[in-house]
UniProtKB/Swiss-Prot annotation:
Keywords: Cell membrane, Lipid biosynthesis, Lipid metabolism, Membrane, Phospholipid biosynthesis, Phospholipid metabolism, Transferase, Transmembrane, Transmembrane helix. The chain crosses the membrane at residues 1-21, 64-84, 112-132, 135-155, 156-173. Its EC number is 2.3.1.275. Belongs to the PlsY family. Pathway: Lipid metabolism; phospholipid metabolism. This is Glycerol-3-phosphate acyltransferase 2. Catalyzes the transfer of an acyl group from acyl-phosphate (acyl-PO(4)) to glycerol-3-phosphate (G3P) to form lysophosphatidic acid (LPA). This enzyme utilizes acyl-phosphate as fatty acyl donor, but not acyl-CoA or acyl-ACP. Signal peptide: none annotated. Probably interacts with PlsX. It catalyses: an acyl phosphate + sn-glycerol 3-phosphate = a 1-acyl-sn-glycero-3-phosphate + phosphate.
Length: 194
């Protein structure tokens, strides 16, 4: 049963929301526009606010659904494994030849279901960084780095702490191109369209 749950979680995560919105509503492949990332930020930049928010919401829902699947079929260990599989699916989608997003929204959705107070404070940190720097990627990196410590602070179960460390590492790892652009001074700021 666990194996089936993990496969289903991966497939849920693999649904390429930004690609589907770009291809079927706007007539282009988001992997060929903007940063090439299949996620909410690139959707915001290439398609606008409403599509960006839709992609953000659906991608977060993938994380929530994975946690609920894990809770329905097992305990905390299956919860974190299913959530991680959804993030892996989002980042390396079987439907896009193992291309995908950065995992921020899917991770946030999983945290919403596991540790909502930690997510709330991580969001406030993300928001502060974005407001002051105007870099969404920097906000995501900082929020990811802080999130595991917020989960510890709010006394969530150890599997959730472990999940958050691994998920944060995945988010930061997937932001490698953004980190290079931040260091080079070529990263797009909030409000700049691609």
């Amino acid at each position: 049963m666990w194996l089936l749950a993990l496969v289903v979680a991966y497939l849920i995560g693999s649904i390429p929301t930004a690609y589907v919105v770009g291809r079927y509503l706007y007539g282009f492949d988001i992997r060929r526009r903007g940063s090439g990332n299949v996620g909410a930020t690139n959707t915001l930049r290439t398609m606008g606010t409403i599509p960006g928010l839709v992609v953000l919401g659906v991608d977060a829902l993938k994380g929530v659904l994975a946690v609920l699947l894990g809770q329905a079929l097992g305990g905390p260990v299956l919860v974190i494994l299913a959530a991680l599989m959804a993030i892996v699916g989002h980042n390396w989608s079987i439907f896009l030849e193992f291309q995908g997003g950065r995992g921020v929204a899917t991770t946030a959705g999983a945290l919403l279901a596991m540790a909502p107070l930690a997510l709330f404070w991580a969001f406030l940190i993300w928001l502060a960084v974005v407001i002051f720097s105007r870099y969404i990627s920097l906000g995501s990196i900082v929020a990811a780095a802080v999130a595991p410590f917020l989960v510890i602070y709010f006394h969530r179960p150890w599997p959730y702490v472990l999940f958050t460390f691994v998920a944060a590492a995945l988010v930061i790892y997937r932001h490698r191109p953004n980190i290079k652009r931040l260091l080079a001074g070529t990263e797009h700021k909030l409000g700049e369209r691609s």
